[in-house]
Amino acid sequence: YSTTVGKNRPVNILLPVNYDENKEYPVLYVLHGIYCDQNTMMDSWKTHIIISNMIADGSAEEMIVVFPYMFASKDKDACDGITLENVAAYDNFINDLVTDLMPFIESNYAAATGKDNTAVFGFSMGGREALAIGFMYPDLFGYIGADAPAPGLVPGQDWALNHPGQLTEDELSYTTEMPYLIMMGAGDSDGTVGSFPKTYHEIMERNGVTHIWYEIPGEDHNSDKAISSVTYNFCRYVFRAK
């Protein structure tokens, strides 16, 4: 139940093989794109299979993976168009995550806590929200990943909206300790989010934010190759800073 939106919210939770309630596992939150839901990253992109295989062969740490539903509106159950009102509902997920979902996970599962043990990764709109979360809550999240993050993290105009921005360009910076990892990637032929991911990279570079940025040659927005690449590379490094 979410006090943020006043209703029950769906979520998928992937537990490690041989999950042991007496152990504590780091937690990765995986965020979907616009018009999608808690099933999309599994059904369309097989993110759960990629991560499970990586854990099995030792290329990723054992972890709990949480696939939430991001559209956090009190009035609507689903996104019905690209409007500022609907985008604000995706932004409101940040409140739902910190206020309701994280305490639920930490109370009901063998979840390790603290920024050393908490990561967020997202695709498209989910990538934008993952970056916002990383800059807003550096004390809670130590690992931030974004594949093809959508417009609107900072003020800007795209083909659909004039985005007011969740943060200013100057706010894409840290006055305290940075996360252990910020990774962004995108196809270099992305016709949906265009050059916005690269713009975020350039702003972070200008602001002295240590991060990894790369492009996947010839790949578009919904490319299996691009999404699986960023997922794989992020999960190789997550929870391994110490």
Model segments located where?
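Non-catalytic cap/lid and distal C-terminal segments of serine-dependent acyl enzymes
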Residues: Y1-K242
